[in-house]
Regions:
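A short, sequence-level motif marking secondary-structure junctions
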Residues: 146-154
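Glycine-rich beta-alpha loop elements in corrinoid/cobalamin-binding modules
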Residues: 4-7, 11-14, 18, 23-147
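Radical SAM [4Fe-4S] cluster-binding motif and immediate context
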Residues: 155-250
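Active-site/binding-pocket entry motifs
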Residues: 55, 150-151, 162-164
Length: 250
């Protein structure tokens, strides 16, 4: 079941809001990775290339497939057709950012949330300055830092740029990914969410969430949603209030 790249859509919308030109190549659309990347790079001529890594494997203990060689291949292809810096990001990348950046030979990485960090990187790149001092930016040439997951104001993130994706492929048969809060204060030993989103719970206002759901439905015909919060039912009062707000808009 393909999972919509919600984080990437937030990053794309943030860049567009700041006036940057943005194109997305969704590699779920093709088995021919090199021709797809070659065509997009030659047509768009990017000044900056971002690669979003949601998972590092297929999470199947009986038939495991590691995605890292494929990611490295994608980076190599980007370098073949462009001299633009390659920036890695995403949930999968953020778990071990230094090791993965070293393995795939990317230029930079963003550990944790990327919406605001990548916008800042793009602006500084345009000025020809160094980006290694930006919190959250990983570079093998800079000193290693322990605190690498800056937490931003998720409440102010713009509506995801769904128009850059083939939404039908994701939403026609499966629920659409949706997020109304980030962060988790729980201490489950098996979970990486606090590493990626921080331990401070950041909750979006009910009206903002309901408005966004309406936009998804009216503009793209999406009827089913999968809330990807680390814990939708906490706080329980918020979950109940959001449910009532959604029902009231039917």
């Amino acid at each position: 079941m393909p999972c919509f790249p919600l984080g990437l859509s937030y990053v794309a919308s943030s860049l567009k809001e700041k006036g940057h030109r943005v194109e997305v190549t969704d590699l779920f659309d093709t088995d021919e990775i090199e021709p797809a990347l070659e065509e997009k790079i030659k047509k768009f001529v990017p000044a900056l290339i971002g690669i979003s890594i949601r998972n590092i494997d297929n999470q199947d203990p009986f038939n495991q497939e590691i995605y890292l060689p494929h990611i490295k291949s994608a980076v190599d292809i980007c370098r073949k057709y462009s001299s633009a810096p390659v920036v890695l990001g995403g949930a999968g990348y953020s778990i071990f950012p230094y090791a993965l950046l070293s393995y795939v030979k990317g230029d930079y990485g963003i550990a944790g949330e990327g919406e605001f960090v990548l916008c800042e990187m793009a602006e500084i790149f345009e000025k020809g300055l160094s980006v290694t001092e930006i919190p959250g930016v990983i570079s093998l040439s800079a000193a290693k830092t322990e605190k690498i997951f800056p937490v931003h104001n998720f409440i102010s993130s713009p509506v995801p740029a769904l128009n850059l994706f083939n939404i039908g492929k994701y939403a026609d048969k499966n629920p659409m990914s949706f997020q109304c809060k980030r962060g988790c204060a729980m201490k489950c030993i098996y979970c990486t969410n606090p590493l990626i989103e921080g331990r401070k719970l950041r909750i979006r206002p009910l009206a903002v969430v309901a408005d966004e759901i309406e936009i998804f439905h009216k503009n793209y015909g999406i009827k089913n949603f999968f809330f990807v919060d680390s814990n939708f039912n906490y706080p329980s009062e918020y979950a109940m209030s959001l449910s009532k707000e959604i029902i009231s808009r039917k």
